[in-house]
Amino acid sequence: MRCPKCGGNKSSVVDSRQAEDGNTIRRRRECEECQHRFTTYERVEERTLVVVKKDGTREQFSRDKIFNGIIRSAQKRPVSSDEIEEIVNRIEQKVRSQSDNEINSEYIGSLVMDELAELDEITYVRFASVYRSFKDVGELESLLKQITKGSKKKKDK
């Protein structure tokens, strides 16, 4: 492993442990030439996933795109970035567990909406308003009625 400080090619592993996500190994290394310590991460190489969008175009799966979409929807809401990261991890795990290398964007969107419905209703509505591209206020109103019914059922339990 090349040292980021001096560019030396020889380093030794000082410490090695499993990272928090359980899918990555974190290694502390020390350069044998300049004694600089640095961290590397090792993970299984994932298969490339392709997202098929509504218009038929294809693009590589991006967990950052999901994360950023949720962040925008959760702006000024009591939702932490750790909670969002956990949601994105669960969604990515579900998507990668599919046998197909191509995933419809609608499937990913529905996974996000399912997660947000459990997390925060306002964040859910904000995301849904963009994801579903409501044609008029009536469509949004029917979504709000569904959420209100769901909230009442949760409170009654």
Swiss-Prot record:
What does the entry give for GO biological process? negative regulation of DNA-templated transcription
Q: Name one Pfam family in it.
A: Zn_ribbon_NrdR
- Keyword Cell membrane present in the record's keywords: the answer is no
Q: Name one GO molecular function term.
A: DNA binding
Q: What ranges of residues constitute the unnamed zinc fingers?
A: 3-34
| Residues in ATP-cone domain copies | 49-139
Q: Which domain of life is it from?
A: Bacteria
Q: Which cofactor does it need?
A: Zn(2+)
Give the record's cofactor note, including how many are bound: Binds 1 zinc ion.
Region of interest called Disordered, as start-end residue ranges on this chain = 1-24
Name the keywords, alphabetized. ATP-binding, DNA-binding, Metal-binding, Nucleotide-binding, Repressor, Transcription, Transcription regulation, Zinc, Zinc-finger
Q: What role does it play?
A: Negatively regulates transcription of bacterial ribonucleotide reductase nrd genes and operons by binding to NrdR-boxes.
By sequence similarity, the record places it as follows:
Belongs to the NrdR family.
NCBIfam families from the entry?
transcriptional regulator NrdR
List the protein's name: Transcriptional repressor NrdR
* Annotated source species: Streptococcus sanguinis (strain SK36)
